């Protein structure tokens, strides 16, 4: 009975000490921002919440972006990192709870005395253990906060990569469409220059113009024709860039019919000025990394003090 009272006193004392922990919460620094920002309109909706590439009404681009987000190697690595941080966070939470262990032993002996064997009955034993670390100085709580901050930082890093991939894919696609249109213009120009060369040749042979005009038409045709290989190479490189972003081998990229007469919305929502920085995933990631660093400091400080672990076997 006395031992039980001592054990209860130890538990009560441990809980009292743990409630008087030395840990401090992280606080956001003062940024000294202006009281107001002059802006045209305030809207809680922001274009970051919209599938802005759908404004172009290009289903091919939408499919390409979805495929890129699904197959991009860096995006897959970021998603795997999120799962890793999530599991580590679960481990940090579980460390605050008691641990239960069990061991099973089996023994069987056979002795041989001058050719006569004597066997003993098998012996079995089971041992159970219970361990619990009392979080006196907040080390385990700091570990939980550190795991949560690292998990949230990995989520924001994936969001930043997703936004970057969407922007890079859309820009590369529009550049590819622009190169296609430029090549089409050059081909039409070459066709026109070929007709001009034929007309200049007929005029020269008929004595209507000098040879200089005929040679000038040939020079203009050669100049326009020289642009075709350069544009074809740029198109191939741009297709390779899009294929790499989509996690595929270099191949032909499907194009949609790009409408130059796009109907844009009258107002593109930019969101509330007070939340613009808070919505940026790189800023949010940096904030969570700061929280994780502060938690690591708390863990290191708490490790300076002795730990109390209760073990029962």
Q: What are these model-derived regions, one by one?
A:
Residues 3, 149, 156-272:
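Periplasmic alpha-helical coiled-coil/stalk elements that build and connect Gram-negative outer-membrane
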Residues 145-149, 156, 288-291, 295:
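Amphipathic alpha-helical segments that line or abut small-molecule/effector binding pockets
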Residues 78, 147, 154, 231, ...:
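Conserved anionic group-binding/transfer micro-motifs
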Residues 41-67:
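Regulatory alphaC helix of protein kinase catalytic domains
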Residues 136-143:
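Short, polar/flexible loop-turn hinges at active-site or ligand-entry regions and domain interfaces
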Residues 20-38, 66-135, 237-254, 260, ...:
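A small-residue-enriched
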Residues 2-18:
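Sec-dependent bacterial lipoprotein signal peptides
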């Amino acid at each position: 009975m006395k031992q039980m009272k001592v054990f209860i006193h130890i538990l009560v004392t441990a809980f009292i000490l743990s409630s008087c922990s030395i840990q401090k919460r992280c606080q956001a620094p003062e940024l000294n921002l202006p009281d107001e920002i002059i802006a045209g309109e305030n809207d809680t909706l922001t274009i970051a919440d919209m599938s802005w590439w759908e404004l172009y009404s290009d289903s091919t681009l939408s499919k390409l972006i979805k495929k890129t987000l699904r197959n991009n190697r860096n995006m897959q690595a970021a998603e795997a990192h999120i799962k890793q941080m999530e599991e580590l966070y679960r481990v940090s939470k579980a460390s605050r709870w008691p641990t239960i262990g069990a061991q099973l032993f089996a023994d069987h002996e056979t002795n041989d005395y001058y050719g006569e064997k004597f066997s003993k009955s098998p012996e079995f034993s089971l041992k159970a253990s219970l361990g619990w670390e009392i979080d006196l100085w907040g080390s385990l709580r700091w570990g939980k906060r550190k795991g949560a901050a690292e998990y949230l930082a990995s989520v924001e890093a994936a969001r930043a990569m997703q936004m970057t991939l969407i922007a890079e894919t859309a820009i590369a696609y529009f550049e590819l469409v622009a190169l296609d249109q430029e090549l089409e213009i050059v081909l039409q120009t070459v066709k026109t220059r070929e007709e001009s060369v034929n007309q200049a040749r007929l005029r020269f042979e008929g004595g209507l113009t000098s040879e200089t005009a005929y040679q000038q038409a040939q020079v203009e045709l050669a100049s326009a024709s020289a642009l075709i290989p350069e544009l074809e190479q740029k198109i191939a490189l741009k297709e390779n860039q899009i294929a790499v972003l989509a996690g595929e081998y270099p191949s032909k990229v499907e194009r949609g019919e790009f409408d130059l007469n796009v109907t844009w919305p009258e107002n593109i929502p930019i969101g509330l000025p007070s939340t613009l920085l808070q919505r940026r995933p790189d800023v949010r990631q940096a904030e969570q990394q700061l929280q994780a660093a502060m938690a690591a400091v708390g863990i290191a400080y708490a490790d300076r003090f002795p730990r109390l672990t209760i073990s029962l076997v």
